[in-house]
Amino acid sequence: MELADEITIPAPRDRVYEALNDVDILKACIPGCEELEKESDNELVAKVTLKVGPVKARFSGRVTLDPSKAPEMFSLSGEGDGGIAGFAKGVADVELIEDGETTILKYVAKAETGGKLAQLGGRLITSTAKKLSKMFFEKFEKIMSGEVELEEAS
């Protein structure tokens, strides 16, 4: 499965990059996120509960950031284990383009699933991934614009 999108964030690139590395902001924006902790400068561990069609699962996962070209570009890779529900793993390439006082965020993500999740079918997985991505970025935009305080977003 592959997802790609472009979102305009109402903040300068450096602020957007910092926010995308802020554990509290990420935890507030990630749908179903129960725990998110920084293990190192480039590694996060998380517990997330998600419902995909009829399957509800609690995933334990790890995300690794490659900031070698930051803040213009960075890559993420991650995997999560949902027990009997299956697993998900993927990679994403993110580009942050300065546009005056705003930032254009472009991403391309590739993911694969296994177990019960994979049996649900590609269309359901893709539509759920798009919905979750939209929820993340809507909340992220509201936090970055000041429309919602971080405490309210949690």
Residue ranges and their predicted role:
Residues 2-6, 43-45, 58-60, 73, ...:
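Intrinsic-disorder/low-complexity, polar/charged segments enriched in Ser/Thr/Lys/Arg/Asp/Glu/Gln
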Residues 33-36, 62, 114-117:
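A short, glycine- and basic residue-enriched loop/turn
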Residues 114-154:
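A conserved amphipathic terminal alpha-helix motif
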